Amino acid sequence: MYKTLYTREYQQMLALLRVKRTDAQVSQVELARRLAWTQADVSKCETGVRRLDVIELRIWLKALGYELADFVRELDSCAPLLPDQAL
């Protein structure tokens, strides 16, 4: 099994997370404060060094004022899995 951390789809998810943060006009420092994390942790997640689990993703999005379900729908519309990419 390959690691999804390195897939195009995961990179698209990270890019969308960055867009959501910048659209909300929230810096990495401010997001870190809202999450009670460090700015380095936020940066590591946004660059793919550290993986977010689904619970962390939900908390992250809530801190920015977004719902997980809406984020997943948006991600799915811009990065659909091809049949041969399904896990």
Locations of regions flagged by a protein language model:
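A short, Lys/Arg-rich alpha-helix, primarily the initiator
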Residues: 1-23
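Short, charged recognition helix plus adjacent turn
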Residues: 1-7, 70-87
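Short basic helix-loop element that most often maps to the first helix and adjoining turn
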Residues: 15-34, 59
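Recognition helix of helix-turn-helix/homeodomain-like DNA-binding domains
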Residues: 36-52
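Short, solvent-exposed alpha-helical "recognition" segments
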Residues: 51-54, 81
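DNA major-groove recognition helix of helix-turn-helix/homeodomain DNA-binding modules
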Residues: 55-71
